[in-house]
Amino acid sequence: MDKAQQDALKKAAGIEAAKLVENGMIAGLGTGSTVKFLVDELGRRHQEEGLEFTGVTTSRRTQAQAESYGIKIVDIDDVDHIDVTIDGADEVDKNFNGIKGGGAALLWEKIVATNSNQIVWIVDESKVVDTIGKFPLPVEVIPFGAGHVIKKFEACGYKPVLRLDADGKEVRTDENNFVVDLHLERIDHPQELAEDLINTVGVVEHGLFLNMVDKVIVGDPNGPRVMTNANK
């Protein structure tokens, strides 16, 4: 699948997911290449159809994109609930376990998700896998002592790599933390790994989102299809 085909599937999923946002809602808006198409469609509906809703974003770049369309964006602490959050995912399996954080927004994404009545992910078909872990698992760590955290990950066999930008500088999250990517190839026991990571001093959050999502909208060549989590 080339990039143009992949983008077409992402766009289709984003447009389908935008239908979930209705007048008067408080909607969580995620981060990433697929969410960009979602926000474009919500912006179109706002400007052309008069859709009025309030957004809570998981990154400053999503906030900037939404506000460019005139969409009202507020801080998460200014609302008492979020009706639905629509976000992307880097991988998701049949058990609705996922990896997120490829865009370095995992902490804000998880905060918004855990305060949402409904969580929906939008992905292209390449993101649906049998076992998560092929995509590097992002872990947000504070800069102080990050080298020691990386050494601990190395000792565990996690194959950690500090994420750098195109200029060779450390990627910083919106909270000014570092991102360490774990190259695990596959994760057979995600719950155990999640507990191990979050209990590591210096770790702020990890990109394992386990059985959190209610629905996954998959961009498919035959049209968007929906995976519904029966356990939610």
Curated annotation (Swiss-Prot):
Pathway: Carbohydrate degradation; pentose phosphate pathway; D-ribose 5-phosphate from D-ribulose 5-phosphate (non-oxidative stage): step 1/1
GO biological process: D-ribose metabolic process; pentose-phosphate shunt, non-oxidative branch
Enzyme class at the top of the EC tree: isomerase
Gene Ontology terms, MF aspect: ribose-5-phosphate isomerase activity
E.C. designation(s): 5.3.1.6
Amino-acid positions noted as binding substrate in the UniProt annotation, renumbered to this chain: 31-34, 87-90, 100-103, 127
Pfam family for this entry, one: Rib_5-P_isom_A
Keyword annotations: Isomerase
Reaction catalysis annotation: aldehydo-D-ribose 5-phosphate = D-ribulose 5-phosphate
Active site: 109
Membrane-spanning intervals of the chain: none
InterPro entries: NagB/RpiA_transferase-like (IPR037171), Ribose5P_isomerase_typA_subgr (IPR020672), Ribose5P_isomerase_type_A (IPR004788)
GO CC annotations, alphabetized: cytosol
Function of the molecule: Catalyzes the reversible conversion of ribose-5-phosphate to ribulose 5-phosphate.
Subunit-structure text: Homodimer.
Family indicated by similarity: Belongs to the ribose 5-phosphate isomerase family.
Protein name per its UniProtKB record: Ribose-5-phosphate isomerase A
The species this protein was found in: Bifidobacterium longum subsp. infantis (strain ATCC 15697 / DSM 20088 / JCM 1222 / NCTC 11817 / S12)
Name of encoding gene: rpiA
